[in-house]
Amino acid sequence: MILNREFYKRDALEVAKGLLGKILVREIDGVILRGKIVETEAYIGSIDKASHAYNGRRTERTEPLFKEGGIAYVYFIYGLYHCFNVISGENDDGQGVLIRALEPLDNFDYISLKRFNKKFEELSTVKKRDLTNGPSKLCMAFEIDKKDNYKVLYEKGDLYIEDSCDNYDITQTTRIGIDYAEEAIDFPWRFYIKDNKYISKK
């Protein structure tokens, strides 16, 4: 069952925790890819110097952050990579959740060929973990890029998120790669499924 619209109309911290264990579904040329969300980070623009929307900063790039929760926000970094975020909250809240890592669930050869031009069985143990254990890696594996910006995630299409009833132990800690963010460096707004081998960093 697809997560409904109301799921996303909450605080980014709630959504970030709630997304753990949920299933990201991607359809590419008739192939269905599914990945369990195992690591997330919350960003709350009004108080968060790590957020693209800090202090109400509103540009063409950050506009998705100010929409109602339940759409995709995809941005480009370092001129090379994409990052996939889920918008949370109400209109004008400036909140979102970065999807940091997935555990691939099926079509392993398809994903492996996308990432490393090899079949899954040909990959080393390290390379198998590297398929989707980071925000840009999962975007490459699932072909998520700027064309997916603003996509609605609570309706069936080529990118959406399904519910899951499984329960997990969750670790809460600080976020990664935000050394510029002053006091926000210490906000414990990263969440991951404990002991999952696909998380980007403990």
UniProtKB/Swiss-Prot annotation:
Q: Which SUPFAM superfamilies match?
A: FMT C-terminal domain-like (SSF50486)
GO process terms (BP): base-excision repair
Q: State which Enzyme Commission number(s) the record gives.
A: 3.2.2.-
Pfam families reported in the protein's UniProt record = Pur_DNA_glyco
Stored Gene3D superfamilies:
Methylpurine-DNA glycosylase (MPG)
Q: Which InterPro entries match?
A: Formyl_transferase-like_C_sf, MPG, MPG_sf
Question: Which keywords has UniProt assigned to this entry?
Answer: DNA damage, DNA repair, Hydrolase
Q: A Gene Ontology molecular-function term? A: alkylbase DNA N-glycosylase activity
Family statement drawn from the similarity comment of this UniProt entry = Belongs to the DNA glycosylase MPG family.
**HAMAP family in alphabetical order:** 3MGH (MF_00527)
State the protein's name.
Putative 3-methyladenine DNA glycosylase
Q: What is the lineage of its organism?
A: Bacteria, Bacillati, Bacillota, Clostridia, Eubacteriales
